[in-house]
Amino acid sequence: MNNITKFEDITNSLISRRSLIKKGFAFGGLALMSSTLGSITAYSSQSFFNFTKVDCNNNDTITLPEQYNWSVVSKWGDPMWSDVEEFNQTSCGSHESQLKSVGDNNDGMELFITSDNKTLLAVNNEYTNHKIIFSNRKSLLPENKEDVLKGMYAHGVSIFEIKNSNNQWNLVKDSKYNRRITPFTKMEITGPAKGHSLMKTKEDKDGIYAKGTWNNCGSGRTPWGTYLTCEENFNNYFSSSDKNLKSTNELHRYGIRTREIGLNWAKADSRFDLSKEINEPNKVGYVVEIDPLNPNSTPKKHTALGRFKHENAELVISKNGKIVVYMGDDERGEYLYKYVSNESINKVKDKSTLLSNGNLYVAKFNDNFTGEWLLLDTQTTGLSSKAEVCIFTRLAASKVGATTMDRPEWIASNPKKNEVCCCLTNNKNRGIKTNKGGDKVDVDKVNPRKNNKYGQIVRWKP
């Protein structure tokens, strides 16, 4: 990594909404990283979007220029199979209907085209809004096991066929490709952590599979046509029925608490009870690979890509054919990562193994706008095995002195230039207090603002 782009605080400058769209977004947002406001406004006089200006309003709808229109493709609770009743506005559905319906709170998504020219949409269902999904309850919370299960089934991934008819895209019920992936879907564990003692539970004595995925945030896709879904804020779903259970440094580092916060998943499934399954949290916090074209395939949790609060997974092919995956840990004071496969894409038959065998790196930025990728292995981190590096990736990154960042979220590579960008959301703790691991979160050149409310974009050349 070198030639890190200089950041300037442009948040106090006034940029018109339309100018931002025309000159910033037209170049993938990179114009926002120019060194001065003048270079942004002078970036280009060419108009990339020819549409009528839309005035600001606070109407409870989507307002588009008159040349455009919008429509809903799918929404929470839409049945994916014809044997499921239509969404009931009064009951807000049941756990049985939710299992076969579109999940809640869409986040990352990707389109896939099948060999028979069908269009599939893979959508992350990140979390639930209790005030909506449990609006049939006075408490606006899950009040019994069935309620908890309904909330659980609303998490995960929804994969369904969509079809365009008269300029309206709609979900195709009963498509052979339709699939719900939930916190109960069996998944294969791959990479260094597979079979490690830290992955073994009462249900999985060999530590070779995980049960489900949840809090799926951003996404990614592979050149071989599979979907990558990223597990983010997985920590809030665990609790302990034993109030005397003492937390550990590893649990604390990932924000996993013993106190129940209202989701009550442990009441429906004991694996979320830390006093009964202390290793269960080690099975979540990964990038999960799903083949949307094969609804009978088993999803894979790739531990080689590290365990943290993944935002998205930006996968590119390097000049030597190796797979490179850029990833951000979306929490204040956490890190930016890179994974590089051991083999090149044209030398392996099972392309999925490229995400199981490789090396994990974490970014360190210097004050002269250069940087380096620090290898995370047993020698550099002092951890006893590569499996521990992959399970306790945050601890590993802290040990090598990586640069704490201001919530690294979505990462995107430029398909026409040798550069990568990462959006950093904010960090109210910058220059004020450490992260959960006690790492300094000082003001520096790459994170130049104390109490950073607005974030920044970092660009680097691999």
What are these regions (language model features)?
Residues 155-163, 255, 283-292, 339-340, ...:
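Beta-propeller blade signature
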Residues 105, 215, 283, 309, ...:
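Beta-rich catalytic cores
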Residues 16-33:
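N-terminal export leaders
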